[in-house]
């Protein structure tokens, strides 16, 4: 499986989003459209990004009763995006329904389950979610549920990736957000790592936002991170 960097387009407006994408000229990217961008601007965001030939990870983190998620995914299938996220906490019937909706629509969109957010610490999880286990065990449990329910993969931090890979096999997609370079600030993420860490532990994709979008030269920073992720421990500055 080819390793790819997904750029998080965490912009509030379509105008700022397209202004950023136009800096990459002919380069075809894999980009993440999150709730802020999609809900504030609507489906036109998807249309404009697709017009430019970029792949889309629509990160809506759907979580509702199975029939509602099935119907929502059926509606989103018409965009023929590359990846869509749902919450593993929605349970097996919800996960199965989301995957079934894409299959029935005849599209190849990958359905990926969110495990624990990288902004969640173990203390947060125990106090606020009342899950009295380690965060690693919680993530591995959600990953097992996702695989058994037939979805294509999970989103997790790098910290759990190696064990998910061992548990779920080589074809299972693992997406790591919370990726930073050593000199970057953590922002609101708590469980973070570098592109080289993600490569070493077996991630399929990494999601990088501010490290690229907030850089004075985003094209150069993107290529640096791409090289680091593709080469892993073989990367030499």
Swiss-Prot record:
Family matches, as Pfam families: OMPdecase
Keyword set includes Glycosyltransferase: no
Domain of life where this protein originates: Bacteria
SMART domains to which the protein is assigned, alphabetical: OMPdecase
EC number annotated for this UniProt entry: 4.1.1.23
Family matches, as InterPro entries: Aldolase_TIM, OMPdecase, OMPdecase_AS, OMPdecase_bac, OMPdeCOase_dom, RibuloseP-bd_barrel
Reactions accelerated catalytically: orotidine 5'-phosphate + H(+) = UMP + CO2
NCBIfam families: PRK00230.1, pyrF
The species this protein was found in: Fusobacterium nucleatum subsp. nucleatum (strain ATCC 25586 / DSM 15643 / BCRC 10681 / CIP 101130 / JCM 8532 / KCTC 2640 / LMG 13131 / VPI 4355)
A GO BP annotation: 'de novo' UMP biosynthetic process
Catalytic residue list: 61
Functional summary from the UniProt entry: Catalyzes the decarboxylation of orotidine 5'-monophosphate (OMP) to uridine 5'-monophosphate (UMP).
Subunit organization: Homodimer.
Family in the record: Belongs to the OMP decarboxylase family. Type 1 subfamily.
Disulfide links within the chain: none
Swiss-Prot/TrEMBL keywords: Decarboxylase, Lyase, Pyrimidine biosynthesis
Pathway named in the protein's UniProt entry: Pyrimidine metabolism; UMP biosynthesis via de novo pathway; UMP from orotate: step 2/2
GO cellular component: cytosol
Ranges that cross the membrane: none
Sequence positions that bind substrate: 10, 32, 59-68, 118, 180, 189, 209-210
Protein name per UniProt: Orotidine 5'-phosphate decarboxylase
């Amino acid at each position: 499986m080819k390793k790819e960097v997904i750029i998080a387009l965490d912009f509030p407006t379509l105008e700022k989003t397209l202004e950023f994408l136009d800096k990459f000229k002919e380069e075809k990217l894999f980009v993440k459209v999150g709730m802020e961008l999609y809900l504030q601007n609507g489906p036109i965001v998807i249309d404009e990004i697709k017009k430019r030939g970029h792949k889309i990870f629509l990160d809506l983190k759907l979580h509702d009763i199975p029939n509602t998620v099935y119907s929502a995914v059926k509606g989103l299938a018409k965009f023929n995006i590359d990846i869509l996220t749902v919450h593993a906490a929605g349970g097996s019937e919800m996960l199965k329904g989301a995957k079934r909706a894409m299959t029935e629509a005849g599209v190849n969109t990958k359905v990926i389950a969110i495990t624990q957010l990288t902004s969640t610490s173990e203390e947060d999880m125990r106090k606020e979610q009342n899950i009295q286990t380690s965060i690693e065990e919680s993530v591995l449990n959600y990953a097992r549920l996702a695989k058994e329910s037939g979805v294509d993969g999970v989103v997790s931090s790098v910290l759990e990736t190696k064990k998910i890979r061992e548990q779920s096999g080589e074809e299972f997609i693992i997406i790591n957000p919370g990726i930073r370079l050593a000199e970057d600030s953590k922002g609101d993420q708590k469980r973070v790592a570098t592109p080289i860490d993600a490569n070493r532990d077996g991630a399929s994709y990494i999601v990088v936002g501010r490290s690229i979008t907030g850089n004075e030269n985003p094209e150069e920073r993107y290529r640096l991170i791409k090289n680091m992720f593709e080469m892993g421990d073989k990367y030499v500055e």
